[in-house]
Amino acid sequence: MNEIERRRTFAIISHPDAGKTTLTEKFLLFGGQIQVAGAVKNNKIRKTATSDWMDIEKQRGISVSTSVMEFDYLPAGQEGEPYKVNILDTPGHQDFCEDTYRTLTAVDSAIIVVDSAKGVEAQTRKLMEVCRMRNTPVIIFINKMDREGRDPFDVLDELEEELKIKVRPLSWPIGQGARFKGVYNIYEHQLNLFTPNKQRVTEKVEVDIQSSELDERVGEREAAQLREELELVDGVYPKFEEETYRSAEVAPVFFGSALNNFGVQELLDCFVHIAPSPRPTQADERLVKPEEPKFSGFIFKITANIDPNHRSCIAFCKICSGKFVRNQPYYH
């Protein structure tokens, strides 16, 4: 895997309070960048979230500016060079949506977070429209499954109707609310069992969906319901193909709870496998390919005087080709 192929640059987007920043924290935890994940709950910060670093974000429990974070990640059991993951945690509130729209010009894919109880909301529709205009592939994470919410099939129907994209579940919840026991990873055929408030996965086992072991681990009633629902999933939704995802025709769907770490690691593992590496960028005159040796890029965000101790300006640049060299002049 060369330097281009191993890069994954994506934005996490959603309507306010769906759980973007909490999901970002869990990704950073699995990436080894932090030891304890912060979270935003009821607009209060439970341990300051890494990406919500501004004073106003800490005080109000919301993201007002896009934060950019990076870590190396290699899924368990995989050998070789790790993927270089760049996360852009975006604001959800409409007052700061221009920041999010600019950020979406600089990413190769996006993860949309949806509240399982509220479903598709106003800002989710607007952000999906931007992704569709730019032909940006999206993965959808149905969050807060540990709370009482809507039937998963109803949520999937709403996703297709409101976001105007075909969906394909790659994980499936076992129970919901107080009965939520974890998720079945359809993509890797694994049963993932969790304990609330744990920072790591409690147990992950490969189990045949028809085996008696499934009944022993989740209970006969839950196992029977899971088998029935997975049969419906296979009958209703198309077989997943990576190319249809990368061409933005189909959105893979995962279920879980970012706050309690349900379903997060399998989302991250699948994402680094299927998400696109840097793609060619359409310039005014031609298509710029990432493997071209000459440096080119564009500024998608500028911040000034954020830290009162440092009166400075920071420009965030999306590299389209070549390699950026410090202290070298570049021209518009």
Question: What do these predicted regions represent?
Answer:
Residues M1-H332:
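Structural and coupling elements of P-loop NTPases
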